[in-house]
Amino acid sequence: MGRVAQISRTAVLAAALQLADEQGLAAVTMHAVARRLHVTPMALYRHVADKDALLDGLVELLLTEYPRPSAEGRWDERLVALADGIRATARRHPAVFPLLLTRPAVTPTARRVRNAVQAALREGGLPDPEAARAERLISTAVLGFAASEAAGRFRHHDQSVIDEDFAELLRWLRRALPVPGDVP
């Protein structure tokens, strides 16, 4: 009798991410991930409850690629570093990145990122309600730009123009924040 392949949640998510990177998000099915891991589809259910849980796991995996939120450095510089990390993640995983726009940000890693952004904004002088709103608006703008770039919307422009546009977006966002301090 053959030996049963041992898999883990990490292996399941890595296989799903690799499959999406190679063939697109539509190719990510429980059967396709199982084939990639040389197991039966039922073996996956020990690690992910269903397709929605698999997609939520992919969101978690993408979020772990962001720079770890730090308390060091200026609050606005930390936000720029995070925005740059988000954009880099979108470039690495253009097929999967749109999940960040459609899946609820309720996982522990999503909350960690959201809380770090809100903490930086509070450090910059925004009170709690405004920090939460600013986080939503900033996240929407940065995720939208990164998703647009990853989807090829800007492909007819030189990369230097796209890079400058992203830097300008971040400057606009910084100027829009009602916090004390000089605008970089």
How does the language model describe each region?
Residues 139-143, 147:
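Amphipathic alpha-helical core segments of compact helical bundles
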Residues 1-32, 36-39, 49-56:
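Basic, helix-initiating cap at the start of DNA-binding domains
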Residues 82, 101-137, 164-167:
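Amphipathic alpha-helical packing segments from all-alpha helical-bundle domains
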Residues 67-106, 135-138:
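Hydrophobic alpha-helical connector segments
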Residues 60-65:
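Short, basic, alpha-helical segments at the C-terminal edge of helix-turn-helix-like DNA-binding modules
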Residues 47-48, 134:
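Residues in the recognition helix of alpha-helical DNA-binding motifs
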Residues 151-184:
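C-terminal peripheral helix-coil segments that are non-catalytic and often amphipathic
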